[in-house]
Regions:
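Hydrolase active-site cap/lid region
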Residues: 13-67, 113
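Short alpha-helix in the alpha/beta-hydrolase fold that links the catalytic acid
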Residues: 59, 83-92
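Acidic catalytic loop of the alpha/beta-hydrolase fold
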Residues: 78-82, 109-110
């Protein structure tokens, strides 16, 4: 009855582990403000640097393998560290069951902040409870 939760670089690490490893007991995956590709995010930070990185660990390579485990992606649309389009791309590559929450004025890893926690915490708890108790 594990729920895996990854923020930022933790997201691709979780996706890589699920794609390559044992998934037994994993009931849900939540990714907050993560990125789809190491090279893409590196190029956004330092133009031209992406070609130096090994893309074999990028989340976009493994996101489809999460299914049938329920997946929740969360991202702030005002994130200036990792653009929200990364979560949108991961969502488009993922298989059902999946859910995407975009926080209109949310910044980087802002879903649990004082500013947004009350709004999104309930949705996240509902997602977890639904994943742990799929009969309800």
């Amino acid at each position: 009855r594990l729920v895996l939760f990854g923020q930022r670089i933790g997201g691709p690490n979780i996706l890589d582990a699920i794609g390559r490893g044992d998934r037994e007991g994993i009931r849900a995956v939540i990714l907050d403000s993560t990125f789809a590709s190491y090279a893409t995010i590196a190029n956004q930070m330092i133009p031209g640097s992406g070609y130096l990185l090994d893309e074999s660990y990028s989340g976009e390579n493994y996101i489809a393998s999460v299914s049938p485990i329920p997946l929740l992606l969360i991202h702030g649309k005002a994130d200036h560290v990792i653009p929200w389009q990364h979560s949108e791309k991961l969502y488009s590559l993922a298989k059902e069951p999946k859910r995407l929450i975009l926080i209109p004025d949310g910044e980087h890893i802002d879903a649990f902040s004082d500013r947004h926690g009350d709004v999104y915490r309930e949705q996240i708890v509902d997602f977890i409870l639904s994943a742990l108790n799929p009969q309800n």
